[in-house]
C-alpha cells in the first residue's frame, strides 16, 4: 500500500511540475527590467481587493449539459496554429477567440470587469499596476495547471521571432510594462503608461501553455501547424478531430474549471461541436432544413425571407430569430491595395469610392435590411467621428476624380483610358459566399463611371491567402472588432505596409492586417501618438483625426453595417430569456444555448412523417438595438 501511495504521489507531483523552457528562463534573466520575482510578503499592504461578484449572472440555470451540436464550415482552417502565417483566419473564433480567457472578462451586458482566470484583483494607488490572485483550480484543456509561469511564458512566446507575427511582437513589447510573480497563483502586471481602462487592458493578459511548447523553436510554423494549442476554455481539438477539408470537431473538457464558477457555469453546454465542410451556402441551408444542422446564420434576405415558405418553418419546427446587439461594427467593404499600380494614386481611389454603389446593393440585394457603413471605425461611441460620411455613388464625381489621374479618354467598350493607353481596370475579389451574387451590381455600376471591375471569386481559404500575401487589387473583406477603442496600428500603420530593403526600395509586407498597404507618414504619426496617449480627451481627439485621415486617404470603401445577427434554429436548441447578451456577435460568442437530444429524435421523426408541430414562429429581440 505504501508503494502504491508513493507512486500515486510521485505521479501527482510529476503532473504538477510543468515543463520549464531553459530558453525562456534565460530570457527572463536577460530582461530583469521586465520580469520580476518576489514573495507574498512583498505585496503592498494598502491594496483593496475586488472580485466582481456584484454583477448579474447572465447564463440560464435551466441549461442542460450534453449533446452534439451540428454545424458547417465552408472550409477547414489552413492551420491550427494560433499565431503566425495564415493563423488569423475565419475559423479562429471557434478554435481560440471564443474558447479562451484572460485574467478578467467584461460583463457582456454592463461592460464591467468580472473575474476569469483571476478570482480577485486590486489596482495600485498610482493606477499603473494591477494585482491578480489566480484561480488554483483553472487548467488548460490538456489538463495542465495554469500558474504564474504561464503568464511569464506568454511574453517570451509572443516576443519571439520564431512565431513570425510582428503584431504580437509589437503588442507584447510596447503595451506592457512588466510582470511580477509573488507565488504560483499571485501576479502583478504593470502598464507602460497611464491610459483609460487600465484595469481592463491589463486584465486581457492570457497565459500560454508552456508544457505544450516543449518543442518551441525556429521550426514553430511547421512543428505546430496541425496541432491545436491548449486553451483555458471548455473545448479542444484532438488529432483525429481535425480532418483537413472534411471536418473539425471540438470536444468538451470533462469537469471544466468554469463549470464551478459564477459567470461561466451553465454555458458552453454541448459535449461535442461538429463542423462539417459544406462549401456551398445553398447546400448548408438545405442541410439546415433537413435537420442535419441544428442552427445557422441566415443573414442573406433570400434565406431570411425565403424560410417563410419552407415546410420546416411552416410546420413549426424551425424558428427564425433576429437579434440586435450593441457592438463596434465590423468594417465590411472594399479594401484597395495601394501598393498596386494606379491604385497608389489617391485620385483613382476617390474615383473608386464614387463608382461603387453599395447603397444599391443594400436596397436591392439586402432589401434595405442593412445600413450603409460610413467609415472604418464605427460603433466606438465618443471615439467615433459621426460627421464622416461615406462618399455617395456619382458617375460625375467618379469621372472627375479619374480625370485628375489622367483618365480622360473613353475606349470603344466605355472604359476610360489615359494617354498611355492604360485602361481603368482592376480585379475585384470576393469569396464564394452568397455575397458574390451582387458582384454584377458593382460591376455594372462601375461601368457607368468608365471603370472596369474584373470579378474574381475564390474559395474562402484561397482568398484569405491571396489577400494576406497582398496579391489582390481590391477585395471585399471585414475585420472583427474587439474592444471599444480604435486599434489602427495593425490595419493602417506604415510598419505593417512595407518592408524596406537594403537598397532603399520598398516592397509590400506580407502576412499583416494592413491589407490596403497604406503607408502614410501622417497617419502613422497619429497612430503612434494615440498609442502613447495617457488621457482620454487627447485620445478622443487623436481618434477623430485618424478617422478623418483614413477617410481622406480613401483606401477603404465603406460597405454596410449589420445591426445584429439572424439565425434559424430547430426546436431542440434552447435559448435563455432575452435570447442572448448585448455583446454577442452570434450564439456561440458566449455559449448560452443548450440542446435537448431527445427532442431532436422526436422532432425529426414527426417532421418526416408530416406532423405539424405548431404555427410558424419568428422572434425579434431588439432590447439592445442602437441604430
What is the predicted role of each segment?
Residues 70, 147-154, 184-190, 234, ...:
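Alpha-helical secondary-structure segments
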Residues 119-164, 188-190, 284-287, 342-344:
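Aromatic- and charge-enriched surface segment that lines or borders ligand/interaction sites
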Residues 135, 223-226, 256-308, 443-460:
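Ligand-site clamp/hinge motif
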Residues 36-57, 66-125, 156, 230:
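N-terminal lobe/hinge region of extracytoplasmic solute-binding protein
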Residues 161, 165, 179, 238-249, ...:
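Extracellular/periplasmic solute-recognition and catalytic clefts
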Residues 64, 168-217, 223-225, 234-241:
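Surface-exposed binding/hinge segments that line
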Residues 18-25, 52-53, 241-248, 332, ...:
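Detector for C-terminal structural segments
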Amino acid at each position: 500500500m505504501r508503494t502504491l501511495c508513493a507512486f500515486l504521489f510521485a505521479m501527482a507531483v510529476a503532473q504538477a511540475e510543468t515543463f520549464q523552457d531553459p530558453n525562456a528562463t534565460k530570457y527572463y534573466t536577460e530582461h530583469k527590467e521586465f520580469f520580476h520575482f518576489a514573495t507574498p510578503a512583498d505585496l503592498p499592504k494598502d491594496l483593496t481587493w475586488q472580485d466582481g461578484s456584484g454583477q448579474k449572472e447572465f447564463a440560464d440555470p435551466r441549461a442542460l449539459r450534453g449533446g452534439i451540436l451540428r454545424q458547417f464550415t465552408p472550409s477547414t482552417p489552413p492551420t491550427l496554429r494560433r499565431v503566425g502565417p495564415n493563423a488569423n483566419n475565419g475559423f479562429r473564433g471557434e478554435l481560440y477567440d471564443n474558447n479562451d480567457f484572460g485574467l478578467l472578462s467584461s460583463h457582456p451586458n454592463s461592460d464591467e470587469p468580472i473575474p476569469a482566470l483571476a478570482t480577485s484583483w486590486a489596482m495600485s494607488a498610482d493606477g499603473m499596476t494591477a494585482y491578480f490572485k489566480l484561480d488554483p483550480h483553472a487548467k488548460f484543456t490538456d489538463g495542465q495547471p495554469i500558474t504564474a509561469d504561464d503568464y511569464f511564458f506568454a511574453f517570451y512566446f509572443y516576443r519571439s521571432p520564431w512565431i513570425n507575427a510582428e503584431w504580437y511582437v509589437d503588442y507584447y513589447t510596447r503595451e506592457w510594462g512588466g510582470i511580477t510573480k509573488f507565488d504560483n497563483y499571485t501576479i502583478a502586471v504593470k502598464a507602460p503608461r497611464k491610459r483609460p481602462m487600465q484595469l481592463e487592458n491589463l486584465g486581457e493578459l492570457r497565459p500560454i501553455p508552456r508544457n505544450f511548447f516543449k518543442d518551441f523553436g525556429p521550426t514553430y510554423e511547421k512543428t505546430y501547424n496541425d496541432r491545436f494549442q491548449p486553451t483555458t476554455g471548455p473545448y479542444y481539438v484532438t488529432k483525429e478531430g481535425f480532418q483537413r477539408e472534411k471536418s473539425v470537431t471540438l470536444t468538451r473538457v470533462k469537469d471544466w474549471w468554469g463549470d464551478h464558477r459564477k459567470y461561466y457555469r451553465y454555458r458552453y453546454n454541448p459535449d461535442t461541436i461538429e463542423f462539417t465542410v459544406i462549401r456551398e451556402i445553398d447546400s448548408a441551408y438545405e442541410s439546415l432544413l433537413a435537420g442535419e444542422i441544428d442552427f445557422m446564420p441566415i443573414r442573406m434576405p433570400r434565406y431570411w425571407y425565403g424560410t417563410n415558405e419552407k415546410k420546416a418553418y411552416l410546420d413549426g419546427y424551425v424558428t427564425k430569430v433576429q437579434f440586435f446587439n450593441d457592438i463596434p461594427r465590423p468594417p465590411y467593404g472594399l479594401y484597395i491595395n495601394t501598393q498596386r499600380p494606379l491604385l497608389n494614386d489617391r485620385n483613382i481611389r476617390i474615383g473608386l469610392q464614387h463608382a461603387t454603389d453599395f447603397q444599391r446593393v443594400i436596397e436591392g440585394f439586402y432589401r434595405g435590411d442593412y445600413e450603409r457603413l460610413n467609415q472604418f471605425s464605427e460603433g466606438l461611441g465618443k471615439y467615433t467621428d459621426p460627421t464622416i460620411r461615406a462618399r455617395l455613388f456619382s458617375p460625375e464625381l467618379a469621372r472627375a476624380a479619374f480625370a485628375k489621374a489622367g483618365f480622360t479618354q473613353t475606349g470603344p467598350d466605355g472604359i476610360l483610358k489615359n494617354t498611355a493607353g492604360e485602361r481603368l481596370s482592376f480585379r475585384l475579389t470576393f469569396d464564394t459566399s452568397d455575397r458574390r451574387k451582387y458582384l454584377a451590381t458593382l460591376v455594372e455600376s462601375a461601368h457607368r463611371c468608365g471603370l472596369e471591375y474584373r470579378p474574381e471569386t475564390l474559395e474562402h481559404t484561397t482568398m484569405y491567402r491571396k489577400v494576406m500575401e497582398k496579391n489582390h487589387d481590391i477585395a471585399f473583406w471585414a475585420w472583427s472588432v474587439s474592444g471599444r477603442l480604435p486599434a489602427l496600428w495593425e490595419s493602417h500603420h506604415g510598419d505593417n505596409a512595407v518592408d524596406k530593403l537594403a537598397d532603399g526600395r520598398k516592397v509590400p509586407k506580407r502576412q499583416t492586417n494592413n491589407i490596403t498597404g497604406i503607408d502614410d507618414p501622417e497617419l502613422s504619426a497619429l497612430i503612434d501618438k494615440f498609442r502613447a496617449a495617457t488621457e482620454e480627451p487627447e485620445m478622443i481627439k487623436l481618434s477623430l483625426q485618424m478617422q478623418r485621415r483614413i477617410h481622406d486617404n480613401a483606401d477603404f470603401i465603406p460597405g454596410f453595417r449589420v445591426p445584429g445577427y439572424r439565425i434559424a434554429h430547430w426546436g431542440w436548441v434552447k435559448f435563455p430569456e432575452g435570447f442572448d447578451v448585448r455583446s454577442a456577435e452570434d450564439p456561440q460568442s458566449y455559449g448560452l444555448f443548450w440542446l435537448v437530444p431527445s427532442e431532436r429524435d422526436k422532432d425529426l421523426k414527426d417532421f418526416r412523417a408530416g406532423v405539424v408541430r405548431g404555427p410558424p414562429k419568428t422572434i425579434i429581440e431588439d432590447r439592445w438595438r442602437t441604430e
